[in-house]
Swiss-Prot record:
This is Cyclin-dependent kinase 7. Coiled coil: none annotated. GO terms for molecular function: ATP binding; cyclin-dependent protein serine/threonine kinase activity; protein serine kinase activity; RNA polymerase II CTD heptapeptide repeat kinase activity. The gene is cdk-7. It comes from Caenorhabditis elegans. CDD domains: STKc_CDK7. Residues 5-289 form the Protein kinase domain.
């Protein structure tokens, strides 16, 4: 590694990379260094995996509080190391930690941060295409950041087709499961709806074992779309007729503790017709974000105990009250 960074420990290993915790000797800050493994001849370009090239290209162009920051790129012959903001945990660990109680204000804060980061991507014509809890990182100050842009793509070119084999199956929109090759921001919004549901249930809402089983699980809960509710459904490459195995029940049957304004938001994110599905901007304007309880402070978001930061003093607004994360609708 570069002499600027002092490696502290190995954090984990993925299919294409090893990740290390290191200290930036110039700033004194902790960083995460992703050391890219050499790709095979078929999947690599000039010895470097294409997903790494795509991630570098995208992250060098975008900067937002809710998107992981790429601080440095270190190249050496055919290896490459990406230096990122260090984050303490991810949303998957938070969801799975049974000692953590996620209050409505916590869920609203996480949802808003997700949408703000994703809205920034979509405004800049970028699809993430792999949103799921472990691709949402959190630091000890409660900042949520989107990460892992290996499947991300620019979109918007007329008649451009993409692969439908994107997004982890449990978070995959039905148009992808039906083989759509032309799609837009709706695939990311569908994933956000699945993540919100997982925050509420503490388990995946649609844990399909195959693409067909995934559709069955979706239709069992949301009902079956019709040509009237989803006009182009039957024209998709992999369309098959699927009948729900259970009687349709309203969302409040599955989320009995959720307020109606949150159910309305989720229903909009799970609209079958992607053209009618909510966008990030529309989602942020929903009644859910206008009503109490408002979002908690970022630093009040709970973390797994072993990563829990020391208690910090609460900040106060000028009038002596605690500030809250709210959107300005004026």
């Amino acid at each position: 590694m570069s002499r600027r960074y002092d490696t502290i420990k190995h954090l984990g290993e993925g299919q294409f990379a090893n990740v290390y915790l290191a200290q930036d000797l110039e700033s004194g800050e902790c960083v995460a260094i992703k050391k890219i493994k050499l790709g095979s001849r078929e999947e690599a370009k000039d010895g470097i995996n294409r997903t790494a090239i795509r991630e570098i290209k995208l992250l060098k162009e975008i900067h937002h509080d809710n998107i992981i920051g790429l601080r440095d790129v270190i190249g050496h012959r055919t290896s490459i190391q990406l230096v990122f903001d260090f984050m303490d945990t991810d949303l998957e660990h938070v969801i799975k930690d049974k000692e953590i109680i996620l209050m409505p204000a916590h869920i609203k804060n996480i949802t808003m941060q997700m949408l703000l980061g994703l809205e920034f991507l979509h405004v800049h014509w970028i699809l993430h295409r792999d949103l799921k809890p472990n691709n949402l990182l959190m630091n000890k100050m409660g900042r949520v950041k989107l990460t892992d842009f290996g499947l991300a793509r620019f979109f918007g070119s007329p008649n451009r087709n993409y692969t439908h084999q994107v997004v982890t199956r449990w978070y995959r929109a039905p148009e992808l499961l039906f083989g759509a090759r032309s799609y837009g921001v709706g695939i990311d919004i569908w994933s956000v709806g699945c993540i919100i549901a997982e925050l509420l249930l503490r388990n995946p809402i649609f844990p399909g074992e195959s693409d067909i089983d995934q559709l069955v699980k979706i239709f069992n809960i949301l009902g079956c779309p019709t040509p009237e509710t989803w006009p182009n459904m039957t024209e998709m490459n992999s369309y098959v007729i699927i009948k729900p195995q259970t009687e349709y029940m309203a969302l409040n049957y599955y989320f009995s503790a959720a307020p109606q304004d949150l159910l309305d938001l989720m229903a909009g994110m799970w609209t079958f017709d992607p053209i009618k599905r909510l966008t990030c901007t529309q989602s942020l304007q929903m009644e859910y974000f206008r009503t109490q309880p408002f979002c908690c402070l970022d630093e009040e978001l709970p973390l797994p105990k072993k990563q829990q930061p020391q208690k910090r003093s609460r900040r106060l607004d000028d009038d002596g009250t605690r500030p809250v994360r709210r959107l300005n609708f004026d």
